[in-house]
Swiss-Prot record:
Gene it is expressed from: ruvA
UniProt-recorded name of the protein: Holliday junction branch migration complex subunit RuvA
Primary site of residence: cytoplasm
Domain notes: Has three domains with a flexible linker between the domains II and III and assumes an 'L' shape. Domain III is highly mobile and contacts RuvB.
Location in the cell: Cytoplasm
Keywords associated with the record: Cytoplasm, DNA damage, DNA recombination, DNA repair, DNA-binding
Similarity-based family: Belongs to the RuvA family.
Flexible linker, as annotated region: 144-151
Pfam families named among the record's database cross-references: HHH_5, RuvA_C, RuvA_N
Species this protein is from: Ralstonia pickettii (strain 12J)
Length: 193
């Protein structure tokens, strides 16, 4: 299995890339979140990859972070969710936003993504519950949330609060707040109910 590609970015045409690695050109599909962070063509690029082997094709999907790749892997395990829909989900929202939507059971946020209807959104919420939120801080190169916010979230989960309660409490903590102060503010928000 190909887990990582490092080479020269030859072409980029959303969502497709062509990366030259020692004279071999790899065609890779990426979510838009990764696409927007790519260097200019001709520059060096490093992507974490997921290879999918089908009867009629060998496909490579690339990601800028380990969190995106792991979320993609979780998504394609769900019945009825293929790589195309998984890429659409990761293009439509960040890993942190997806984890929050799952934690808060917000099907409406998922139905805004092209290709996701109400039933698919509900299946995603059901299948991903408990698989994303608690792991946010443990994935190297994780989502675009501060380490302090992840530490506060993990502290609340360790104290026995549910994913949903912890996520709602985190919303009450201003960005840039330290861990200890963040925990105090989150606990205060939880005590108010």
């Amino acid at each position: 299995m190909i887990g990582r590609i490092a080479g020269t970015l030859i072409e980029k045409n959303p969502p497709h890339l062509l990366v030259d690695c020692h004279g071999v050109g790899y065609e890779i599909d990426v979510p838009m979140s990764t696409f927007y962070n790519l260097p200019a063509t001709g520059e060096k690029v490093v992507l974490l990859t997921q290879q999918i082997v089908r009867e009629d094709a060998h496909l490579l999907y690339g990601f800028g972070t380990a969190a995106e790749r792991e979320t993609f892997r979780q998504l394609i395990k769900i019945s009825g969710i293929g790589a195309r829909i998984a890429l659409a989900v990761l293009s439509g929202m960040s890993v942190a936003e997806l984890a929050q939507a799952v934690t808060l059971q917000e099907a409406g946020r998922l139905t805004r993504i092209p290709g996701i209807g109400k039933k698919t959104a509900e299946r995603l919420l059901l299948e991903l519950k408990g698989k994303l939120g608690a792991d946010l801080g443990t994935v190297p190169g994780g989502p675009a949330v501060s380490d302090d916010a992840v530490d506060v979230l993990n502290a609340l989960l360790a104290l026995g609060y549910s994913d949903k309660e912890a996520a709602l409490a985190i919303k009450q903590v201003p960005a840039g707040t330290g861990v200890s102060e963040g925990i105090k503010l989150a606990l205060k928000a939880l005590s108010k109910g």
